[in-house]
C-alpha cells in the first residue's frame, strides 16, 4: 500500500513539474487519470485488508455474542455465521478471496 501512495505522490509531482504550456493540460490530465486509478486500487487494497482483519477477529469470538454489521448507514444484528458470509461476500467484491 505504501508503494502505491509513493507512486501517486510521484505521479502528481511529475504532473506539476511540466514546463510546456501546450502539453501541460494534456499531461496533467493523463497524470490525474493515472493517479485516480492508483487511488482506486489502493482503496480496494485497504478495504480488503480491513475485511480480512474483521474476519480474523470474528473467528476469535464465540457464537453467543451479538454481532453487528454495517449495511449502508445502519448497523444490523447478525449471527456469527451471517457475519462471516457477509465478510466473505464483500471480500469477493473487492477481488479478495472469501476463504
UniProtKB/Swiss-Prot annotation:
Q: Where is the signal peptide?
A: none
Entry keyword set: Coiled coil
- A cellular component annotation (GO) from this entry: prefoldin complex
Q: Which SUPFAM superfamilies match?
A: Prefoldin
Q: Which Pfam families match?
A: Prefoldin_2
Per the record, the coiled-coil ranges are: 3-68
Name the residues that span the membrane. Answer: none
- UniProt-listed GO biological process terms: protein folding
Q: Which InterPro entries match?
A: PFD_beta-like, Prefoldin
**Single GO molecular function:** unfolded protein binding
Put simply, this protein is called: Uncharacterized protein aq_754
- Record organism: Aquifex aeolicus (strain VF5)
Amino acid at each position: 500500500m505504501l508503494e502505491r501512495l509513493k507512486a501517486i505522490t510521484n505521479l502528481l509531482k511529475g504532473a506539476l513539474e511540466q514546463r510546456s504550456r501546450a502539453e501541460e493540460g494534456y499531461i496533467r490530465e493523463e497524470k490525474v487519470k493515472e493517479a485516480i486509478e492508483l487511488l482506486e486500487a489502493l482503496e480496494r487494497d485497504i478495504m480488503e485488508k480491513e475485511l480480512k482483519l474483521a474476519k480474523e477477529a470474528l473467528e476469535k469470538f464465540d457464537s453467543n455474542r451479538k454481532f453487528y454489521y454495517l449495511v449502508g448507514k445502519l448497523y444490523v444484528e447478525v449471527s456469527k455465521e451471517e457475519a462471516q458470509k457477509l465478510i466473505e461476500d464483500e471480500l469477493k467484491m473487492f477481488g479478495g478471496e472469501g476463504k
